[in-house]
A protein has these predicted regions:
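Cap/lid segment of the alpha/beta-hydrolase catalytic domain
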Residues: 95, 99-186
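Aromatic-residue detector
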Residues: 15-16, 27, 84, 97, ...
Length: 186
């Protein structure tokens, strides 16, 4: 029954031929392009540079187990500069730590359960930002990162893509920090 419904929709083929080790990269690119153009929108290219300014720092946070930095990340977009705050919590481990990028529904450590201390206790760093500091979850594309690019094409990027883009900019910054093991970021 489902196969009949799919045939009736006359969908384009996802890939001509069989997927194997030799053509996997091409197949993956086709799938990513389909999702971009038909579902989530096309994400603009990464900026040339991500700038970071430490706005606040506490070297003895979370019961003395970690350093906390509030960092303002900024980068240039089509319609100007965009910046948003990221809170970095880095364990006092004496070595490079794995890190979790955590787009939060609430501002840093203000409401609800955020397992920051538990994560630090396991030797992981944490990079937390509130999704609303990037762009609000509504149909308005005039605030935050949403205002930084022109709109009008059918495959313009959406809010999920913008939050993912922000996660990537956080990663760009994390990769510059010796305290973070850049090969172990989730």
């Amino acid at each position: 029954m489902m196969e009949e419904q799919i045939r009736a929709r006359r969908l384009p083929p996802l890939f001509d031929g069989e997927v194997n080790a030799q053509n996997f990269d091409e197949w993956r690119k086709n799938i990513v392009d389909l999702y971009a153009h038909e579902c989530f929108g096309v994400t603009p290219p990464a900026p040339r540079e991500v700038r970071a300014v430490v706005a606040e720092q506490n070297d003895d946070d979370w019961a003395g187990k970690a350093e906390h930095r509030k960092v303002m990340l900024s980068f240039d977009m089509e319609n100007g500069e965009f910046s948003f705050p990221v809170h970095l919590v880095i364990p006092k481990a004496g070595r490079s730590c794995p890190c979790v990028v955590y787009p939060s529904f609430t501002p840093y450590a203000t409401a609800g359960y955020q397992p920051i201390e538990e994560i630090v206790d396991q030797g992981f760093a944490l990079a937390v930002f509130c999704y609303e500091d990037v762009t609000r979850d509504n149909e308005d594309f005039t605030d935050g990162l949403a205002a930084m690019t022109s709109r009008g094409a059918a495959d313009d990027w959406g809010k999920i893509g913008m939050w993912a883009f922000a996660c990537s900019r956080v990663l760009d910054h994390l990769l510059t920090l010796p305290e973070i093991d850049g090969s172990r970021v989730a």
